[in-house]
Amino acid sequence: MTLFLRTARTAFLSYFIAMTTAYAQDAQPADIADALAEEPVQENSAAETETPDLFARDTFRVRPIVCPFKGEVDYKGGEISCSLFEVPENREKARSRMIELHVAKLHAKEPDDWNAEEKGEWKKREDPIIYLTGGPGAKAQGYVNRFKDHGIRDARDLYILEQRGIGWSADFCQDYALFDPAAANTPDWETYQQAGLEAMEACFAKAKAARVDLSGYNTIENARDVHALRQALGFDQWNLWGISYGSILGQAYLKEDPAGIRAAVIDAIVPLQQDVTFFHIARHYDRVLTILEDACKEDSACARDFPDLVERYKNAIKKVAANPIELDAIDEELFPSGKAYFFHDLIGGAPFSLFYEQKNYPSLPAFISALTRMVEEENYDALRIATAGGGGDGFDISQGMYNAISCNDGWAPGIRKSFEQDGLDHPVLSMIFGDPSLADEQAKICKRYGADPRPAEEYLPVQTDIRTLLVEGVMDPITPPPLAEIIVPGFANGTYVEFPYAGHGPTRSVECAGDFLTKFYDDPQGELDLSCPESMERPEFSGPLFATNGLTNLAVMFSEDKKSIALPVIWIGLAAVIFLFGAVVYTLAPVARVINRSGAMPTGGARIIAWLTALAGTASIGGIAAGAAMAVQENALLLLAGLPGWTKLAALAGLAAGPLGVLLLWLTAKARMQTPLPIGVSLGLLLTGAAGVALAAWIAVWGFLPF
C-alpha cells in the first residue's frame, strides 16, 4: 500500500483504537533544512560500487536472545524462541555498516486433539517454514501472537523474520507513530495530507543524521537477508510462506535463492514487477463492495434491511468530503485547539479495513448502513471517543521502513498513474485514498535522501518451476484475484487457489488453513486437497444494528473523568445483583412452598410482578452485556455504530422493568397496609421494584433508549 493508502485504510481504526497519526517528533522541519544544508546527499562513490560477492561480509551467525515481546505475548517456555543475526545494511557497498535482524521461532507442537491410536506417534517434520511478513513494515510481534495458535505449528517449526528497518531489526524511526498535536489535526484536507509527507521527511532526515543508508531498505536486500538467514540456520532447504508484501518479497526470494526453497505458498498476491495494477485501490474497493452488495441482495432479509447499501454509503463519503466532521476533543494534550477534525477517509477507510477479515462479513452490511446513517443524521457523538487518546504505535508498523521500500522499489509513478485513472473511473471512492499529486512529492523526498528507484530489471516477473500455491481471497479489498492472475503464467509448477468469501490472506485467517498448508507441504507434488477453500460459504448476514451511543457515552465519560464512571457502574451493578437474586428467589420460592406444603402470605399479586420485574431486569442487563461482548468478538467497530439488533429487545425489557417496578412498589405498599408483611418479604419486594425503576432510568439517562 502507499503512504497515503495506509493512512486511509487505518484511519478509522487509528482514531478509535490508538491515535496513530504518524509524525516523527525528533526531526522537525527546521532540523530537516539544517541537515540538508550541512550534508547534501551524495551519489555513490567508486569505493561503494557493488562487490563481487554480495555475501562476503555476512557472518551467518545467529545469537540467541530473550524474546523482546516476552510478557506481552502469552506463551510457555520452549514454545517460542528468538535470536539476532548480523547482516550488512547494504551489500552493494563495501563500507556499509552492519545491522542486526530479529528472528522469532515458533516451535512445532503436538496438537491437543492428536489421537495416537488412530494416527500413530506424532512427529515434527524436519523441513521448517520461513514466513515473510507483510506491510511492508509489519512488526513480528503481531504475527507471533496470531500464529502461536495457528494450525501450521501442528507439524513444522515456523520462523518469522522481522525484516530490516522494522521493530527490533534496526528500526530507524521508532518514534514515527508518536502523535504531534499540530501536524494532522487540521480542518483542511490538503494540510492533513501534507502532514503525512512532512512525517516521511522528518523520519528520513533523522535517519540520515544517524548515518542510516536508506537505499539499503528495499525488497532485493530483504530477499538476500532471507537467503542469509537460511544459511545461518544451517538448512539446505525450507518452505516459503508469504502474504501481502510477503508475496512480493516471496517472489524476489524465489529468484534469489531457488535452490534453498522446497515448496512455496504466496497469498494476497501483489506482482513483483513495478506494475500500476496494484495501486488501483479504488477499483479494488469498488469490486468488493459490489460483491458484498450482490451477496446481500441474494439474502432476502439482507436485501430488505439494507436497500441501496453502496449508493447511500458513497453519498455519505461525498457528504463528509464536502463537510468535514468537527468535534470537541477530550484530550487537549493531543488536540491543543480543543477541536478534532475527521475527514472522508475515516468514513471510507473503516469498511475497507473490515474487508480484510472474513469474520467481519456477517455484520458488514449492518455496519456500513449504520455508519452511513450516522453521516446522514450528522450524529457524530460516538466518534468523540476517538479523541480520548491512547497514543503509541498500535498497528505494529514501522512506517519508516515502509516509506523506504516504496521509494527504492519505485512505487511513485504507478501510484500517480493508477490514482489518476481511478479518479476518472471511481470518483467517489478514489477521494479517500489521497491526491495523485502526492506521489510526485513523495518521489522528491525519496530522491533528496538517496532512496532512488532500483533498476526495473531486478523486478521482472518470476519464472520458476518450484512447486508453488498462489492463493487469493475473493473478497480481498487490497490484493484481489486480478493481481494474482498477472503472475500465474510465470509459475510452471504452480496452482492457483481461490477462497470464496475470504479476505486478505486466507491461509492466515481461515480456520482450516493450517491443515490445508500442512497437507501441501507434506506432499507438494501430490494431489492438492481443496476441501478447505471449497468449504467457504456465503456469510449469514445479521440484521440492522440497534442504534445506540450508550457504550460510547460511558467510554467518553470514563475518558474525561475516570472517577465519574463509578456512578453508572454502581447504579447498574446494584440493580443487576437485586434482579439476579430476585429471579432465583421468586422462581424457587413456590417450589419450596409446594415441597413444605406451606401457604404463601397474600401480597395482592406483588410476588408475580416482582418475579416479572426480576426476569425483565436480568434479561435486559444480561442481553446488553452479551450484545456488547458479541460485537467486540465479531467486529469491535460495531460499538461505534450500535449493538447487534436483538439487543434492542434487551433495552425494551429494561424499560418494561420500570413500570413493572412502579406497579410492584404500589402493590407492596397496598399489601402492607392490608396485612403486615415480614421485613424480609417487604424488603425484597421494595428493592426489586426500586431496581426496576432504576434500570429504566439508567437506560434513558445513558443513551440505551430503543426508540
Predicted regions and their residues:
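Alpha-helical transmembrane segments forming the membrane-embedded cores
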Residues: A592-F707
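A catalytic-pocket lid/entrance helix-loop region that shapes and gates access to the active site
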Residues: Q174-A184, A252-A316, P351, T372-E376, ...
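Short beta-strand/loop motif that positions the catalytic acidic residue
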Residues: T464, L470-E472
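Conserved alpha/beta-hydrolase "acid-adjacent" motif
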Residues: I478-P482
